[in-house]
């Protein structure tokens, strides 16, 4: 098969085809030669030649067949065979473009006039069929028929079908009519981009409004027209491939002012192409997106890509920058000096700001600490007159409420949970302790009321008038859901039976049980309550002769252990050492090894005045102290576990300031503290 124009078949110029058809493989239909639209000067065809728009062909009547013979003068355009690169090819291209323009016009006219018949006519008689890219330059050796005819080497992938567009081959300087402008390119784009896949004529893109919709259309009308009306040399995507994404990079090499390739491109034939140099175009990346607002860059700037084939570009640019700075008559040096001074000033300012900020932070910390102390004092004052259940974290100023709580199911379940972790006797002691403490709080409240008249409660609604539309109501605070609910029966019942409340209630109950166990252990660790517990376990009543203050019995630090400062620890250790020394002086006559107490003591009364006045007695006491210290080191492992009891049972020092106090080694005390204590004891003058 002879290579035809654009693969539309063999457009033979021979006389064998008397009807002007394009080949035996195509449906026989009349060409445009005798359409009498552009060729009105041809008088060989009668002016009144009728044409029937049948479903199969554009044929004249039988009586006019002779006028369409091969030898007829009307066939001077019917020869579509490729010729050498002469002027005849340019005129041929111009006439083909004219017929394409006429096709788009007559297609719309026929569709409006004949309705559905126009659709069938165009489907059957439309001459776009499977074709190969036409090469109008056979004189050029080794030409790739699938390569678009641009003036630059743009390696553009047309897909697997290799379906080039109609006018892409002639996008170079071979287009004889660049002055047609944007309208010509628009119409040619409409005529060229109607088929997505030219291998199947059934996938006709119905971009005209009168065409009926088809299930084979993968894209909408707007998307089809926007993508395919500028498809010179690009070809539309076939139906075997998915449509391009709206957010992906453009498959087209460039879109200019109006978004159409036919208006202005790289070819330089259109007024908006701006004649870009070919070398610069080759340096561009293979695929790039839309150029915002054409070559003038009226939109946002696109990032310039580095030229990887020029490794010395950066060095050259750096050298040029250096030359510019050298030729600037010292302006760069002055600028650098100013920048250095400005940097030093900024550094000083930042240091000043940092110092001021640190001072402000210290002031803020001090104010916060003072506020914490005030809040702590206020809370302690409130705790002295507020009823409380420590294990349940229940507090109230009303006697009736605390009594209801102590008899409630919640309180009993909490104690039952604690009894699973602690002995039953200890849990009973906790219950008695809570009841007795609330009784003493009630007595204190009565005393305060007798001394001072009750202060009126401040009105929170003071200063709020009716213009603010406030109303005083009663509400319930759900601790589990952390929600305020108006005290209305319907609202309360609705919340009580809600799914969220029941879920939060179970979670809060479990959390309260765990917290109650921790609080109970914290209360029982207090040294005063430990003594009371011992008495209670012995069967005695620990609440009869209790003189300890209520606030020192562990309720101040509910839920947390009290942290002792190093000074408090050192003072307590010194008190234990002095107490042990006094007991050792009093027990001079007994051997130290015979005792099983926590502290190594020597029992026996010794007159303190005589010991201080007799040097022989003082020497004897020092020897006795050394022997006790050596024996204490030998039994250190045995008595290490009992150091806690020694600290709890140690009493305050009762010895006079003028007496000589020998040092007795205590298990668990550091050696440096012992040496310091011994030095202080030796420095005390004797009377």
Curated annotation (Swiss-Prot):
Ranges for region Involved in chromatin-binding: 384-447
Regions of compositional bias (Gly residues) in chain numbering: 109-118
Protein's cellular compartments: Nucleus matrix; Nucleus, Nucleolus; Cytoplasm
Gene: Akap8
Protein's UniProt keywords contain Transcription: yes
Residue positions where Omega-N-methylarginine is found in the record: 109, 232, 276
Protein name in UniProt: A-kinase anchor protein 8
SUPFAM superfamilies: Porins (SSF56935)
Region annotation Disordered: where it falls in the sequence: 105-124, 185-218, 277-379, 624-659
Taxonomic lineage of the native organism: Eukaryota, Metazoa, Chordata, Craniata, Vertebrata
Region (Interaction with MCM2): 1-195
In-chain residues carrying the UniProt-annotated modification Phosphoserine: 72, 199, 320, 325, 336, 659
């Amino acid at each position: 098969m002879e290579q035809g124009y654009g693969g539309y078949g063999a457009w033979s110029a021979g006389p064998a085809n008397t009807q002007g058809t394009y080949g035996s493989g195509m449906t026989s239909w009349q060409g445009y030669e005798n359409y009498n639209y552009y060729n009105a000067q041809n008088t060989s065809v009668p002016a009144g030649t009728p044409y029937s728009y049948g479903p199969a062909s554009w044929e004249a009547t039988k009586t006019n067949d002779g006028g369409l013979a091969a030898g007829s003068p009307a066939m001077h355009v019917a020869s579509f065979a490729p010729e050498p690169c002469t002027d005849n090819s340019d005129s041929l291209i111009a006439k083909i473009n004219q017929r394409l323009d006429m096709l788009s016009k007559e297609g719309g006219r026929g569709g409006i006039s004949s309705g559905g018949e126009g659709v069938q006519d165009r489907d059957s008689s439309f001459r776009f069929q499977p074709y190969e890219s036409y090469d109008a330059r056979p004189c050029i050796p080794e030409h790739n028929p699938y390569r678009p005819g641009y003036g630059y080497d743009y390696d553009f992938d047309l897909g697997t079908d290799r379906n080039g567009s109609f006018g892409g081959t002639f996008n170079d300087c071979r287009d004889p009519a660049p002055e047609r402008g944007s309208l010509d390119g628009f119409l040619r784009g409409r005529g060229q981009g109607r088929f997505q896949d030219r291998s199947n004529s059934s996938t006709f893109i119905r971009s005209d409004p009168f065409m009926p919709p088809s299930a084979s259309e993968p894209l909408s009308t707007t998307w089809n027209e926007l993508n395919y009306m500028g498809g010179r040399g690009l070809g539309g995507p076939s139906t075997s491939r998915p449509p391009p994404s709206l957010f992906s990079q453009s498959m087209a090499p460039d879109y200019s002012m109006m978004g159409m390739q036919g208006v202005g491109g790289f070819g330089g034939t259109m007024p908006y192409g701006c004649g870009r140099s070919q070398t610069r175009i080759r340096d561009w990346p293979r695929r790039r997106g839309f150029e915002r607002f054409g070559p003038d860059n009226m939109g946002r700037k696109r990032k310039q890509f580095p030229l990887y084939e020029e490794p010395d570009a950066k060095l050259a640019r750096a050298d040029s920058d250096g030359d510019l700075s050298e030729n600037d008559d010292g302006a760069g040096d002055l600028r650098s000096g100013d920048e250095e001074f400005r940097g030093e000033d900024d550094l000083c300012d930042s240091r000043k700001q940092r110092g001021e900020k640190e001072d402000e932070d210290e002031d803020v910390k001090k104010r916060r600490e003072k506020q914490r102390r005030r809040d702590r004092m206020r809370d302690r004052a409130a705790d002295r007159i507020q009823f409380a259940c420590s294990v349940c974290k229940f507090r109230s100023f009303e006697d009736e409420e605390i009594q209801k709580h102590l008899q409630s199911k919640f309180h009993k379940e909490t104690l039952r949970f604690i009894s699973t972790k602690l002995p039953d006797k200890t849990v009973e002691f906790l219950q008695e302790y809570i009841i007795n403490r609330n009784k003493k709080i009630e007595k204190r409240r009565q005393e305060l009321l007798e001394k001072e008249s009750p202060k009126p409660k401040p009105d929170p609604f003071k200063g709020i008038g009716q213009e603010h539309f406030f109303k005083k109501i009663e509400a319930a605070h759900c601790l589990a859901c952390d929600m305020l609910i108006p005290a209305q029966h319907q609202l309360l019942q609705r919340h009580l039976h809600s799914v969220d409340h029941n879920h939060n209630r179970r979670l809060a109950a479990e959390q309260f049980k765990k917290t109650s166990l921790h609080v109970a252990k914290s209360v029982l660790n207090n040294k005063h309550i430990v003594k009371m517990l011992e008495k209670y376990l012995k069967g005695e009543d620990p609440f009869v002769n209790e003189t300890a203050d209520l606030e020192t019995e562990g309720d101040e630090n509910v839920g947390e252990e009290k942290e002792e400062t190093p000074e408090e620890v050192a003072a307590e250790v010194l008190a234990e050492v002095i107490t042990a020394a006094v007991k050792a002086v009093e027990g001079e006559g007994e051997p130290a090894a015979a005792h099983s107490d926590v502290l190594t003591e020597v029992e026996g009364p010794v007159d303190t005045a005589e010991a201080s006045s007799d040097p022989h007695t003082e020497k004897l006491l020092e020897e006795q102290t050394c022997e006790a210290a050596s024996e204490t080191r030998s039994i250190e492992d045995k008595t290490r576990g009992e150091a806690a009891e020694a600290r709890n049972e140690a009493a305050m020092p009762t010895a006079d300031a003028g007496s000589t106090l020998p040092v007795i080694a205590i298990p668990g005390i550091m050696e440096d503290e012992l040496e310091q204590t011994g030095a202080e004891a030796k420095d005390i003058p004797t009377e």
